[in-house]
Amino acid sequence: MVISVDFNGSQRGVTRTRNIDVHLQKGERVDDVLSYVKDRYPDLSLSENSCLVIVNNQVTTKDRILKANDRISIIPHIGGG
């Protein structure tokens, strides 16, 4: 199955793309995709403190099981104070 991963903000500078397609096996989770993305883009910060993970427009946990055609958006945290 295939899912899509969208990059936002400064992530696009690291990945040099807006999104990628990822081929998964049935039963794989958000965390599996994040591990794949981290291996492909080692300079990309994907810790819970640096980004929010959204699947199909809903904030989710890393243990969520993915389905074909799911869309993951990785949203970087912006500022603080």
Q: Model-found features: residue ranges?
A:
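Ubiquitin-like/PB1-type beta-grasp interaction modules and other compact soluble beta-rich domains
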Residues: 1-80
